[in-house]
Design a protein with these regions (language model features):
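Alpha-helical transmembrane segments and their membrane-interface boundaries
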Residues: 1-130, 137-188
Length: 188
């Protein structure tokens, strides 16, 4: 509720020139922006559906990983996928070191430390490292240390790899349908 109030206060005096009609007119299957948006809205629910169908706990991790990896250009997406996987593995290793060295009374603060780290991280790879702390701090209590670590890595790898493959196929199909090269197809 507080976020809504702050958003309203900061935006109430802005004039928006684009109405629903303008949004609908801007929809163009040959546009790289439209393709990127369609890829997001189709891929993320598919990842969640498949993770749930496979009875993977914490399916939202796969969905969030996919959502964060999907960017308009494939070259950028490939870098994000790589950074997400490396960042998660590094985050797991850092978490394991902290978990081993710190007393149990401090475990709850590992997640908070991760949140602070995400806030101060300018690079996506480092955000993935610190984001892992909070996720594992919660999941460890539910699944045990080994289960939480395995689940975190598996869900993230599944989410970003599926998103990469899906978007590559999606952009390829959209190029064939529209007859125009999409921005997403570059560098694949």
């Amino acid at each position: 509720l507080l976020s809504c109030l702050v958003f309203y206060r900061n935006h109430k005096s802005r004039t928006y020139e684009t109405g629903i009609k303008g949004v609908l007119q801007a929809f163009d299957l040959a546009s790289s922006r439209t393709n990127w948006q369609l890829c997001q809205i189709i891929c993320v629910p598919m990842v969640l559906f498949l993770a749930e169908l496979c009875k993977m706990p914490r399916a939202m991790w796969a969905g969030i990983a996919a959502m964060s990896a999907i960017v308009p250009l494939m070259a950028d997406m490939q870098a994000r996928v790589k950074n997400r996987i490396i960042g998660n593995v590094a985050g797991v290793l850092c978490f394991l070191v902290l978990y081993t060295l710190l007393p149990t009374s401090i475990y709850a603060y590992i997640g908070i430390l991760g949140g602070i780290g995400v806030g101060f991280s300018a690079k996506y790879g480092w955000q993935a490292v610190f984001n892992t702390f909070g996720a594992l701090a919660i999941a460890e209590k539910l699944y045990g240390l080994k289960g939480a670590v395995g689940l975190r890595v598996a869900q993230n790898v599944f989410g970003v790899v599926f998103a990469l493959l899906f978007c590559a196929a999606f952009y390829w199909v959209m190029e064939r349908v529209t007859g125009r090269r999409t921005a997403g197809e570059q560098n694949i």
